[in-house]
């Protein structure tokens, strides 16, 4: 969560944890609420970020209990990061839809809600209250965005059909955000895809034709990075993008093995793949960023790494940054796509 907050440009001053048996009206218990109030006053905090999706009433109650603060939940934070990363028309459409669907139940009757989203201002109908007008405008915007995204989906489907006629194997890179997928695509394709040390630096699928050593060619696609507790609204909004993984003949699941939560990240990716019905899709596990380990690192003695490796039928250690292990990965890709 700290990594997400930093990725959104926030300075994390303090972290407060609590386990509750059931949700409260303010998201936290009374004692923890008092602790938060003390921290807010002492550190002059202006923003509280919660690592869950809050109900609209919880968000409002928490803001009222902590005067002068803005309360943001996990979904809003992820949407903010996605919005700042979206570069293409398709990416912006998908983020815009997810934002509107998130904010619709949170509209409080102020025009500023829709102005923040870039929505248009309409004429209020006879006997229509302000909040009804806001909601009508939001629903109209959502309907239009869904139509536009459906056009994008159909365009992608036609494009994929043309690709299939080429009879080239399709390989998709999947993985947790910032695992190194774009860098790996660059290394394999010697292309100039954006590869930054940022969360969600890739929101739109990018496909490159790769020539393998055996003379055969494949189509390699980079996809949007996954994340733990990925909001359902985002999965739905990015369906057109995620369909790239559905159409693949082979998935390359890239994991950042230098990250302390590498197993949890792997599980989160597998969970999303399961939701998409891709659990049984052929996969290669790429254990990336091995260059960040000391030279005397003994992988076979690392029980947490062994646990991670058990998630895959086949794994390859590599560094997309230095090129270590890329030759072995290419050999594995050649072998796994040779029957296509």
Regions found by a protein language model. Name each.
Residues 113-235, 242-246:
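Conserved G1/Walker A P-loop phosphate-binding module
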Residues 16, 203, 210, 316-319:
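Hydrophobic residues at beta-strand termini and immediately following loops
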Residues 22-26, 85-89, 130, 192-194, ...:
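Flexible beta-alpha connector loops of hexameric P-loop NTPases
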Residues 67-119, 126, 279-284, 291-340:
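Canonical P-loop GTPase G-domain recognition
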Residues 2-6, 37-42, 54-64, 69, ...:
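Conserved C-terminal guanine-recognition region of P-loop GTPase G domains, centered on the G4
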Residues 1, 48, 100, 138, ...:
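Residue-level signature of catalytic and energy-coupling elements of molecular machines
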Residues 19-21, 53-56, 76-79, 224-227, ...:
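Conserved nucleotide-binding/hydrolysis micro-motifs of P-loop NTPases
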Residues 2-170:
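Conserved P-loop NTPase architecture
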């Amino acid at each position: 969560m700290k990594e997400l907050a930093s990725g959104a440009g926030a300075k994390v001053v303090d972290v407060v944890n609590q386990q509750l048996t059931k949700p409260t009206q303010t998201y936290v218990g009374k004692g923890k609420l008092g602790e938060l109030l003390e921290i807010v006053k002492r550190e002059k905090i202006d923003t509280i970020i919660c690592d869950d999706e809050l109900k609209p009433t919880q968000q409002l109650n928490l803001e009222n209990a902590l005067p002068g603060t803005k309360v943001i939940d996990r979904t809003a934070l992820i949407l903010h990061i996605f919005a700042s990363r979206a570069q293409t028309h398709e990416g912006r459409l998908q983020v815009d839809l997810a934002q509107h669907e998130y904010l619709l139940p949170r509209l409080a009757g102020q025009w500023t809600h829709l102005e923040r989203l870039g929505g248009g201002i309409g004429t209020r109908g006879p006997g229509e209250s302000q909040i009804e007008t806001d909601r009508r405008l939001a629903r109209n915007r959502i309907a239009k965005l869904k139509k536009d995204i459906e056009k994008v989906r159909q365009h992608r489907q036609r494009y994929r059909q043309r690709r299939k006629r080429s009879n080239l194997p399709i390989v998709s890179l999947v993985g947790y955000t910032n695992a190194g997928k774009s860098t790996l695509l660059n290394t394999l394709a010697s292309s100039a895809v954006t590869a930054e040390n940022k969360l969600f630096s890739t929101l739109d699928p990018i496909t490159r034709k790769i020539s393998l050593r055996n003379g055969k060619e494949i189509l390699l696609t980079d996809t949007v990075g996954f994340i733990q507790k990925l909001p359902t609204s985002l999965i739905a909004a990015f369906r057109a993008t995620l369909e790239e993984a559905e159409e693949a003949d082979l998935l390359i699941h890239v994991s950042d093995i230098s990250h302390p939560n590498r197993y949890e990240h792997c599980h989160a990716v597998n969970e999303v793949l399961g939701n998409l019905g891709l659990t049984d899709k052929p996969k290669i596990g790429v254990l990336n960023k091995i260059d960040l380990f000391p030279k005397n690192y003994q992988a076979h003695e690392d029980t947490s790494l062994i646990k991670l490796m058990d998630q895959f039928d086949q794994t390859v250690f590599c560094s997309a940054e230095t090129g270590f292990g890329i030759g072995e990965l290419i050999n594995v890709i050649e072998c796994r796509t040779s029957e296509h």
